[in-house]
Amino acid sequence: MPDAAVIGATLRKLRGDLPRLTVANACGISVSALTMYETGQRVPRDEIKVKLARFYGKAVDAIFFKQDSHEM
């Protein structure tokens, strides 16, 4: 699993120009929790991973379990 910083960068990129409040409300989490996920301070628990993936229309694996091309 990528580290929290990589996951955070992915979440920030997916959010784009959407306000954090919009994403947080849609996923049933606080803005502060989303901020911690996006800044790499915390990794969301599995239930929240699913909610975020659904919101962004992505597979959970695509966001949270990407492998670097040099990993084997």
Protein language model features and the residues they cover:
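A short, Lys/Arg-rich alpha-helix, primarily the initiator
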Residues: 1-17, 61, 65
